[in-house]
Amino acid sequence: TQNDVREGWSATSLICADLWNPGLVHAAMLARPTVLCAPINSASGIVSDDFSNEQNWAINLQFYAMTYGTPVIMTNRFGPEGGSHFWGGSRILGPRGETLAQAEDREMLIHAELSRTAIAKARFELPTHRDADTPLVRDLMLGYR
């Protein structure tokens, strides 16, 4: 769902595994939120020894920020619980996928300044929103029931 957070700014939240489903992300981004909030609950090595949650979350979030010209605010836990270690890595990405702020390997508060002008420019340069053809996607999906 999309929420207005202040005049001219809106946010959509997708929680953890939702961000690994491109269809859910695309559907959420069709509303053109100003910011995507991404609270996750990711531990190191929890998927497999060959899958780096730390590296792959960075790739995933950069891709969506850049593709949709939308800043991403990601939060993750830090510290041990049971046999798992939650790696933290909370970050704020700009509308081109650039890292504006990133937490160190500890609990901490981060902040960054976001610009609606930078968002508009990024969206103009990579027109994912503008070229999204929702009726076409809907029609194509009808064949997969």
Label the predicted regions.
Residues 4-6, 93-94, 112-113:
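Short beta-strand-to-turn element immediately C-terminal to the catalytic PLP-Schiff-base lysine
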Residues 19-110:
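CN hydrolase (nitrilase-like) catalytic-core segments centered on the catalytic cysteine
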Residues 2-19, 23-34, 38, 45, ...:
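Cysteine/selenocysteine-centered motifs that mediate thiol-based redox chemistry or coordinate metal-sulfur cofactors
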